[in-house]
A protein has these predicted regions:
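Transmembrane beta-strand segments that form the barrel wall of outer-membrane beta-barrel proteins
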Residues: 6-10
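Surface-exposed loop/interface segments of Gram-negative outer-membrane beta-barrel transport/assembly proteins
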Residues: 1, 13-18, 24-107, 125-233
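Long hydrophobic segments that form regular secondary structure
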Residues: 115-120, 238
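Alpha-helical support elements that line or immediately flank enzyme active sites
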Residues: 110-116, 130
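Short, contiguous hydrophobic alpha-helices characteristic of membrane insertion segments
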Residues: 2, 236-240
Length: 240
């Protein structure tokens, strides 16, 4: 038995510079062998998304509502945006559209399960899976709306390893019934992270793609993380 599915979505919002894209792929297969005594199940799943989101929804739409429509849509001869002086602390909506709040996410998972009937009442089961995830975030605020500008890049990754093996026995005779199970399980997770925040940009042309051109790093804005917890367990039960 083989199954495959595929999905793709391209979502364009009312704000032309913002959009969302999602891609999903899934494959599954089930196979029997040795006259059905061995059953194998295999699956692969992949997901990818790209999101170009609004940095501050409330600020953007309030700015659009408060903007004087007689003002130019772009910058003046000096490269500055003309603001509505009657609206306090409100930037030109055109300048706010240069803000970026982008993210990318990728997920991958695969698993394999086996079930083998050694005897009619003795079953060996095994299952293993691997998962990988990656999330990237990137933000940019130009100097028109943020003093000295603001740039942020972050990437976070995760891996999960899981395996399970069990042996079960089931038998009945007369008025008696016996169930016995013994199993072992292991789980390991790895998490890594790296993020950088910077200010003091001299030009808005590079967006978040040239952090090296910035002049300052806020305290605590640059760091990394790593952790790798694991868990192993053994269990058994007998019911008579």
């Amino acid at each position: 038995n083989y199954r495959a599915s595929f999905g793709f979505m391209d979502h364009n919002t009312i704000v032309k510079v913002n959009d969302y894209r999602n891609l999903v792929v899934k494959l599954d297969a089930t196979q029997k062998a040795f006259d059905g005594r061995l059953v194998g199940d295999f699956g692969v799943y992949g997901y990818s998304s790209k999101i170009h989101d609004i940095f501050d929804t409330r600020m953007l739409f309030y700015s659009a509502a408060a903007q004087n429509l007689t003002y130019p849509a772009g910058t003046d001869v000096n490269g500055n945006w003309v603001k509505n002086s009657a609206a306090s602390h409100i930037n030109h909506p055109g300048a706010l559209l240069y803000e970026k709040n982008d993210s990318e996410e990728r997920n991958f998972n695969t698993h394999l399960g086996l079930k083998f009937n050694i005897l009619d009442n003795l079953i060996l089961s095994a299952f293993g899976s691997y998962s990988y995830s990656s999330t990237g975030n990137a933000q940019f605020c130009p100097t028109w709306v943020w003093a000295q500008g603001n740039v942020y890049r972050g990437e976070f990754k995760g891996e999960d390893y899981f395996t399970n093996v069990s042996l079960s026995y089931n038998n009945a005779w007369g008025d008696s019934h016996l169930d016995a199970v013994v199993g072992a399980e292991y789980l390991k997770q790895v998490r890594t992270g790296l993020w950088v925040q910077a200010k003091g940009i001299t030009t808005n042309d590079f967006s978040y793609n040239n952090i090296g051109a910035t002049s300052s790093r806020p305290f605590g804005g640059t760091s990394s993380s790593y952790e790798d917890p694991s868990l192993a367990s053994i269990m058994g039960s007998v019911t008579y």
